[in-house]
Amino acid sequence: MCRSSNLEKYVFYDLETTGMSPAFDQPLQFAAIVTDLELNEIERVDIRCQLSPHILPAPQALAVTGVRPSQLQNNNLLSAFEFSQKIQIFTEKWAPAIWTGYNSIAFDEAMLRQMFYQNLQPNIFATQFHNNTRLDVMKMVFAVHAEEPHILKWPINAKGKVNFKLDQLAPENGFRAHNAHDALGDVEATIFIVDKIKKQCPDLYQKLFDARDKERNLQLLKSFTPVEVTLRFGGSSPKTYTGCYCGLSKNSKNMVGFFDLEKPDPMELIHGTQQDVLDAMTKSPQRIRSLRLNQAETIRPASISNPEWRHTCDVIKDDTAFQTVVSECLADKYPQTEDTDSVVEEKIFDGFYSNHDKTLLVQFQISSWQERLTLLNDAQDNRIQQLGHRLIAFNAMHLLDPKYIARAQEFIVEKWTASETEANWNTIASVQRQLAELEASGFDNILLDEMKTFY
């Protein structure tokens, strides 16, 4: 059953950031509008923060958002640490809620998660836990395009393909007040699109709304009845696939096998070898797809069915050996490996913190910087110690001994001067390349000169 009540509400949100990497960029703006389920506004917030000392913003990102270098150095803004604290409090205030954005699962949520992690917030997964659910409106739009394309107008790009970007889709459908690439403007545009889907196609809207809850989705899949999901790969058009649950990865409770019911000869695969199953996952055409329950996919009951599909589902349900093979093949396809050379930003999923460290992080929020430095000596997880000393270097450097100060300064120099081919973050070399590309494209000279002076 879906979790729903009269108190349930949406939190529509968006971020503007220094670049595209959740691990190595940062949010500069967080905007959100809380509504009831009828999309009546309850509250809105619009928060900005300073640039962290170790981050070089991508010139191309500044060009898109229109953020001026002077805004990045505004000392009246919150620090990144204070910014993350304020957003964490906001998530707690409105839980449980339906956290909703446009392409939010792939981008905004990952950015939020990293921001909480790197700024030592107690609840890294704040939008996913505490009975929160999630919707990604871009995925809803994909389902509309595949199932009910007449209810929206579709902007076409230079290649003759549909442009699903919000800054194109919203104006094409009548949203005239869109301040594109401003977080609050994008939130308003997202609500506009949801409202249009809700009014124009209430049946499909309800199915997509019900898919917000991953526990409900797992129950639906494990009913071994035909279900459908709309997916988009690369630049292709979204397509709805009809299939059946066929196993849960032995390595991840969030990954399931999805058996394509529209492909021929299902029994041949069900009674085949383990290699046949692995081939069905890895070779084209795919007969078994992997779905991630924590990615807000648009899983819903199949709109049509037939006796053959239902029979295939029944066979899979009874064939636990086949489900076991699928479970093992999913684990083989997506092995869990530990990268011992990864930097701390990339270790966000290296296990949950102990209860001791969780309690420490709660205390960290209400302590002075001097007290925070002392608390770090008690942390069991090396990630907390490393990120914590970085925070103190950025926010209260006077508390550190010369050894740590020198190390912090060396860290920034090494980060900025790293080889562009080896770094996953913005470096001086990548910044200079992007500035040259903007200049060659005829970008606004005034803003470009400001950028050059800033860098």
Enumerate the predicted regions with their spans:
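Acidic two-metal-ion nuclease catalytic site recognized across multiple nuclease folds
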Residues: C2, K196-A321, E414-Y455
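Conserved RNase H-like, two-metal-ion catalytic cores of nucleic-acid enzymes
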Residues: C2-S79, S249-N254, K263-S284
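Generic detection of long, well-ordered alpha-helical segments
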Residues: L77, F81, A106, L184-V187, ...
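General structural signal for secondary-structure boundaries
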Residues: R68, L78-A80, K165, Q206, ...
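Conserved DEDDh/DEDDy metal-dependent 3′-5′ exonuclease domain
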Residues: V64-E148, S303-N306, H311-V362
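Short alpha-helical segments and helix-capping/turn motifs at coil-helix boundaries
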Residues: Y13-T17, S84-I87, Y241-T242
